[in-house]
Amino acid sequence: MKIEPITGSEAEAFHRMGSRAFERYNEFVDLLVGAGIADGQTVVDLCCGSGELEIILTSRFPSLNLVGVDLSEDMVRIARDYAAEQGKELEFRHGDAQSPAGMEDLLGKADLVVSRHAFHRLTRLPAGFDTMLRLVKPGGAILNVSFLHLSDFDEPGFRTWVRFLKERPWDAEMQVAWALAHYYAPRLQDYRDALAQAADETPVSEQRIWVDDQGYGVATVKCFARRAAA
Ligand SMILES: C[S@@+](CC[C@H](N)C(=O)[O-])C[C@H]1O[C@@H](n2cnc3c(N)ncnc32)[C@H](O)[C@@H]1O
């Protein structure tokens, strides 16, 4: 089963949810601040979805050179329209996070390459990390936060997840999408192996993979690495 791009009514539902719940991005923004994001930097957001993170980041760091990339034409269109509505000039590209095709101008140029809540959808996880490490400049950092497979949840974590799904006042479509996303998500060891494989091609000087919740009870995997200096 393929759950990669989010298209059609699911893309619209995702945008409705995301644009009404900016606080859900706070934890990720805090991680980016910890990773050293600063005004004037070049930042690439792989699997950017409908552009909520871009609106939040450019409000806080107005001179970021920020490029959002998504495999879904629908998401790219929604992100462009949303940015225009918000009076922002932002760049969104159609592209696959599993290949730098269409991002050649950014190879080795980004200070930070990020991805939020999407890498669990990739069919080729090592290729996703490979793209991140190729885009980032020597000494720059990558940060991915995505979902963990259900079998890696402990018992209380699983119960919290079920309660979260039931209680969340979402569109039914989003509830099913979330359940499927966790069902098809990689295991923690898959994340470790994928990052290690990518780091064989583009060496890293520092890396850390850890799991914690997002303050609303759902475990996510965090993957940070710094590309070795030239
Ligand atoms: C749950 S959304 C997250 C969007 C955004 N990062 C956020 O946090 O709001 C996952 C996004 O990943 C995109 N996606 C899935 N596979 C992709 C791939 N191989 N390359 C680029 N985007 C992809 C989907 O189209 C969707 O927009």
Swiss-Prot record:
Q: Which is one GO molecular function term here? A: methyltransferase activity
Q: Does the keyword Methyltransferase apply?
A: yes
Lineage: superkingdom: Bacteria
Pathway participation = Antibiotic biosynthesis
Q: Show the disulfide pairing.
A: none
EC nos:
2.1.1.-
Give UniProt keywords alphabetically: Antibiotic biosynthesis, Methyltransferase, S-adenosyl-L-methionine, Transferase
Cited Pfam families: Methyltransf_25
Is this entry keyworded Ligase? no
- Give GO terms for biological process: antibiotic biosynthetic process; methylation
Q: What is its EC class?
A: transferase
Q: What does this protein do?
A: Mediates C-methylation at the 8-position of the aminocoumarin moieties in coumermycin A1 in the biosynthetic pathway of coumermycin antibiotic. Active on both mono- and bis-amides for mono- and di-C-methylation adjacent to the phenolic hydroxyl before it is glycosylated by CouM.
The UniProt similarity line reads: Belongs to the methyltransferase superfamily.
Which PANTHER family does this chain map to?
TRANS-ACONITATE 2-METHYLTRANSFERASE, TRANS-ACONITATE 2-METHYLTRANSFERASE-RELATED
In Swiss-Prot or TrEMBL terms, this protein is called C-methyltransferase CouO
Q: Which organism is it from?
A: Streptomyces rishiriensis
Q: What is the lineage of its organism?
A: Bacteria, Bacillati, Actinomycetota, Actinomycetes, Kitasatosporales
